[in-house]
Every structure is written in C-alpha cells, then in structure tokens.
Amino acid sequence: MPSPGLVMESGQVLPAFLLCSTLLVIKMYAVAVITGQMRLRKKAFANPEDALKRGGLQYYRSDPDVERCLRAHRNDMETIYPFLFLGFVYSFLGPNPLIAWIHFLVVLTGRVVHTVAYLGKLNPRLRSGAYVLAQFSCFSMALQILWEVAHHL
C-alpha cells in the first residue's frame, strides 16, 4: 500500500509507475539468473578462472544460447533504463491516471512478452511487436515531457 504522501503528491500515477518499474527490475534480475544458469548448463564460461573451476579451460567459450540471454539482457538495459527515467518524470506531470496506467502497463507487458519471445525463440514478429509497443509508450511519455518543458521555458 503506497504511503499517503505518495498518493497526495501524484494521485495514483507514481504508485502505478513504482509497481511497473519494480516488476521490470525484477524481470531483469530473472534474465540475469537465467543467463547464469544457462552458462552452467552449457558449460560456457566468460572467464578462464570460472572455466578452470568448472572443469577446465575448454569451457572458456561462448555458446549461442548464452549469447541469446546476454542479448536479451542488453536489450532490457537499452529499453528499461530509459523507461525508468521517462516514467518517473512523467508521473509528476499530472497525467490522467488511466492514461498513465496504460502507458506503464504497455511497457511492462511489452518487455515481458519481448523477453519470453526472445529467450523462447518464438516468432520474431511477436518479439518485434512487443518491442515497438513498449517503445511507442516510452516515446509518447518523452513527447509529453518535452511538451511540458517547452511550455515552461
């Protein structure tokens, strides 16, 4: 339950952002854990000392599935970090709470679907569509932030 201070300052928007952004950060942690597990399962270690500890230098190598996990994680960093900034600032612009919820849920859903589609090697169109939807929502927030800033110059 959000504190009364958060609700008074920003209506229902900031708590909605905090919920969605926290879930996205947890999702990023999950991808990091999946990457580590994939390294162990495939015996593909990024550091020679890890390979030596796990059986020998022959395991100091790359693996396509590990690389896929790393790309998913990098894509998360390229998209979720900007959302954390944009969503936070957007929360204080006084947006309509329903519209803000939609923005945040579109990003959350898009990023989860993108990750599942990418790691699961599902249809690339599904992955691309999820990516575009999440980015569209971020772009919308960015434009609204710029609009508000321009009106206060």
From Swiss-Prot:
Induction comment from the UniProt entry of this chain: Induced by pro-inflammatory stimuli and down-regulated by anti-inflammatory glucocorticoid.
Names of required cofactors: glutathione
SUPFAM superfamilies for this protein: MAPEG domain-like
Residues on Cytoplasmic side: 43-61, 121-124
Gene Ontology BP term (one): cell population proliferation
Residue sites binding glutathione per the record: R39, R74, N75, D76, M77, E78, H114, Y118, R127, S128, G129, A130, Y131
Residues passing through the membrane, by range: 14-42, 62-91, 97-120, 125-153
Sites annotated Essential for protaglandin-E synthase activity: D50, R127
InterPro entries named among the record's database cross-references: MAPEG-like_dom_sf (IPR023352), Membr-assoc_MAPEG (IPR001129), MGST1-like (IPR040162)
Molecular function GO labels: glutathione binding; glutathione peroxidase activity; glutathione transferase activity; prostaglandin-D synthase activity; prostaglandin-E synthase activity
Family to which the UniProt record says this protein belongs: Belongs to the MAPEG family.
Record-linked PANTHER family: MICROSOMAL GLUTATHIONE S-TRANSFERASE 1 (PTHR10689), PROSTAGLANDIN E SYNTHASE (PTHR10689:SF9)
Record's subunit section: Homotrimer.
The protein, known as: Prostaglandin E synthase
Gene giving rise to this polypeptide: Ptges
